[in-house]
């Protein structure tokens, strides 16, 4: 069955840029996300349901699933007093999860960079042409070298391929431009600095266990490019049917942080505001946003924050004016710049374009306190289309259909339950197969007459 979604009431995107950047607009977006994922008055709570479902699947993957269902199956009117069984789950699923995860991890890769810009392509082409000339004039250059001592070859003769097939291999295996080597080293340093190999293993485990994986990339002035693992149980996103989540317009994650970390991230908060946030009723109860499993690990000195990205568009408007010296002057205007056509004739013209932008926001869950709402300072854009923007969160769920996420562990939980019940039934059968005991009367043996006048 497809996932049911409670639609939130998002503000209109067809408004001015000045209105979009206002805190009031950001609070409307945050409230809509909160309503879509966290409210229970409609009979459903997507965030709570996702956390419970993923928690259950992870317990199955560890062989630590709840045994209450097995006790209910074997008990008679709830009575277990006559059963003497080992209720420990049989670790069937963990073995196959490890096999699948390790098999995926063995598919290693190396980063290879190839320059495709006009300069890099022309440089590669010129290098190939020089080698081809050396191959075609090999006999002539050898004669000139032996007869006149003149080296006419453009490249090292020891590294010269024998034919065009070897030239293709040489270009693939040995030829590297300086910019390509620098790019490969830069990517390797970023991945190693973020311990991406360890993160990749966690992603493989999540894909196998719960069917969805997520990482977040962002830029900080102190640490540069950061790639962080994100628990899929804590993310929120707009409805999508794409397994690569490439058509979502908002995404975010819930983080539980202590008060001191909140002050560190938002130093402009006063002591009075911090105290007010910590004393919010919803923040105290936590029942609106946290599962029963997570309540035990949190205290009243922690705060639930919703970090989110919101994708919308903005209008870039320019006024192009001809100067008295014959030049052209381009002046940036806001999207409300709309002079009459009569004024633009012969004096200036208006140029505009629409492009996607990301807004970043932080909401204290259960309150109307919006800690952050601004245009993202570092936005990723595809090189082929600078009007598009990419989210900071990269999510994938390969077996998703109509919003419903499927995983390997989810498909085998039924078989694991049957194996566990069979294991318990076997224990019952083995207990009934124990033969009847033999009772020996020691006093009776002492009174037996041995026939020699003694007992």
What are these regions (language model features)?
Residues 322-455:
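Extended, charged amphipathic alpha-helical segments
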Residues 1-355, 359, 368-371:
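Extended, helix-rich architectural segments
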């Amino acid at each position: 069955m497809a996932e049911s979604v409670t639609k939130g009431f998002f503000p209109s995107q067809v408004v001015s840029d000045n209105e979009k950047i206002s805190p009031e607009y950001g609070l409307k977006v945050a409230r809509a996300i909160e309503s879509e994922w966290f409210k229970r008055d409609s009979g459903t709570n997507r965030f709570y349901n996702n956390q419970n479902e993923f928690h259950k699947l992870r317990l199955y993957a560890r062989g630590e699933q709840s045994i209450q269902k097995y006790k209910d199956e074997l008990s008679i009117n709830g009575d277990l007093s006559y059963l003497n069984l080992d209720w420990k789950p049989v670790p069937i699923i963990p073995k196959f999860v490890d096999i699948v995860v390790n098999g995926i991890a063995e598919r290693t890769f190396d980063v290879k960079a190839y320059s495709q810009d006009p300069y890099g392509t022309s440089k590669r082409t010129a290098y190939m042409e020089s080698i081809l000339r050396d191959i075609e004039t090999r006999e002539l250059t050898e004669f000139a070298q032996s007869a006149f001592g003149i080296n006419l070859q453009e490249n090292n003769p020891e590294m010269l391929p024998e034919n065009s097939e070897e030239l293709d291999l040489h270009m693939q295996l040995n030829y590297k431009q300086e910019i390509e080597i620098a790019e490969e080293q830069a990517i390797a340093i970023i991945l190693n600095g973020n311990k991406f190999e360890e993160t990749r293993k966690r992603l493989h485990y999540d894909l196998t266990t719960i069917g969805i994986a997520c990482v977040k990339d962002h830029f900080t002035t102190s640490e540069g490019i950061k790639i962080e693992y994100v628990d899929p149980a804590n993310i929120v996103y707009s409805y999508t049917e794409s397994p690569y989540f490439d058509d979502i317009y908002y995404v975010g994650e819930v983080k539980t942080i202590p008060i001191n970390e909140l002050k560190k991230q938002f130093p402009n908060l006063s002591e009075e505001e911090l105290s007010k946030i910590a004393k919010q009723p919803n923040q105290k109860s936590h029942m609106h946003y946290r599962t029963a499993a997570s309540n035990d690990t949190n205290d009243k000195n922690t705060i639930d924050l919703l970090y989110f990205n919101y994708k919308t568009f903005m209008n870039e408007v320019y006024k192009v004016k001809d100067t008295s010296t014959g030049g052209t002057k381009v002046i940036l205007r806001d999207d409300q710049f709309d002079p009459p056509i009569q004024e633009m004739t012969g004096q200036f013209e208006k140029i505009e374009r629409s492009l996607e932008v990301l807004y970043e926001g932080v909401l204290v869950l259960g309150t109307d306190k919006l800690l952050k709402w601004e245009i993202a300072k570092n936005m990723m854009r595809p090189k082929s289309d600078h009007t598009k923007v990419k989210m900071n969160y990269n999510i994938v769920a390969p077996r998703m259909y109509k919003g419903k996420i499927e995983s390997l562990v989810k498909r085998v939980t039924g078989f694991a339950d049957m194996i566990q019940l069979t294991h318990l039934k076997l224990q019952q059968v083995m207990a009934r197969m124990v033969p009847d005991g033999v009772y020996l009367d020691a006093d009776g043996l002492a009174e037996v007459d041995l026939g020699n006048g003694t007992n």
